[in-house]
Amino acid sequence: MSRREDGRLDDELRPVVITRGFTSHPAGSVLVEFGQTRVMCTASVTEGVPRWRKGSGQGWLTAEYAMLPAATHDRSDRESVKGRIGGRTQEISRLIGRSLRACIDLAALGENTIAIDCDVLQADGGTRTAAITGAYVALSDAVTWLAAAGRLSDPRPLSCAIAAVSVGVVDGRVRVDLPYSEDSRAEVDMNVVATDTGTLVEIQGTGEGATFPRSTLDKMLDAALGATEQLFVLQREALDAPYPGVLPEGPAPKKAFGS
């Protein structure tokens, strides 16, 4: 089988690097790199929940996605300067939030909010899937931080790991983790979000240049799930290291009555 322009096999990921503790202030901070795509993912913890959730005793997780002006070849204006958030940005922000809420027990957070921020430093295809993959690691560190602070009712609120990958049909071949040069000419383009328990969170797919049969969809899903298995290994390896910052001290234990 002939190799792709960058030398990879069709089912081969770009080099993936997950760096924890990329910045110091958030409870979780990760730089995730899929080849030349680089995304900073942070998870910040704040007391309180949105107004519509107050009094529920449950927490919340929300996410925002943005691209730096010079993340692509041609500089783009900041959406904050334009005065409105674009439809693509809103769609990806909601996708990241949905994906991560699928793995966490919000009741265990109490009335606290975890805010996920994914900022694309450099884009070369697959920014949303890289963001989800990195944000899960940042979320895991935020959960560790909350546990150390004594703010969790369940010390293990994460039920599974979450990772995502792009997959497409390019030149008639199913390929995973598309860089921009492939993504821009793909006949079929898809993003797959999966759990490490073998289930799916979300599938976004479309025929860009042509329709495609069910058999192609099955091949794409098989390729994507094979790629996410590799990503889960990388996430676990990254999280095997100690927490990369200083953990808070939890509340002092209450004295027993009469002591």
UniProtKB/Swiss-Prot annotation:
Q: Which UniProt keywords apply?
A: Nucleotidyltransferase, RNA-binding, rRNA processing, Transferase, tRNA processing, tRNA-binding
Identify the Pfam families for this entry: RNase_PH, RNase_PH_C
Q: Which reaction does it catalyse?
A: tRNA(n+1) + phosphate = tRNA(n) + a ribonucleoside 5'-diphosphate
The answer, when asked if Repeat is one of the entry's keywords, is no
Give the enzyme's main class according to its UniProt record, as a single word.
transferase
> What is the top-level taxon of the source organism?
Bacteria
What SUPFAM superfamilies does the record tag this protein with? Answer: Ribonuclease PH domain 2-like, Ribosomal protein S5 domain 2-like
This entry's Enzyme Commission designation comes to 2.7.7.56
* Sequence positions that bind phosphate: 88, 126-128
List the GO biological process terms. rRNA catabolic process; rRNA processing; tRNA processing
One annotated GO molecular function is: 3'-5'-RNA exonuclease activity
> Which InterPro entries has this protein been placed in?
ExoRNase_PH_dom1, ExoRNase_PH_dom2, ExoRNase_PH_dom2_sf, PNPase/RNase_PH_dom_sf, Ribosomal_Su5_D2-typ_SF, RNase_PH, RNase_PH_bac-type, RNase_PH_CS
This chain's function reads: Phosphorolytic 3'-5' exoribonuclease that plays an important role in tRNA 3'-end maturation. Removes nucleotide residues following the 3'-CCA terminus of tRNAs; can also add nucleotides to the ends of RNA molecules by using nucleoside diphosphates as substrates, but this may not be physiologically important. Probably plays a role in initiation of 16S rRNA degradation (leading to ribosome degradation) during starvation.
* Homology family: Belongs to the RNase PH family.
Instruction: Summarize subunit and interaction data from the UniProt record for this chain.
Output: Homohexameric ring arranged as a trimer of dimers.
Protein name as annotated? Ribonuclease PH
Q: Give the species this sequence originates from.
A: Mycolicibacterium smegmatis (strain ATCC 700084 / mc(2)155) (Mycobacterium smegmatis)
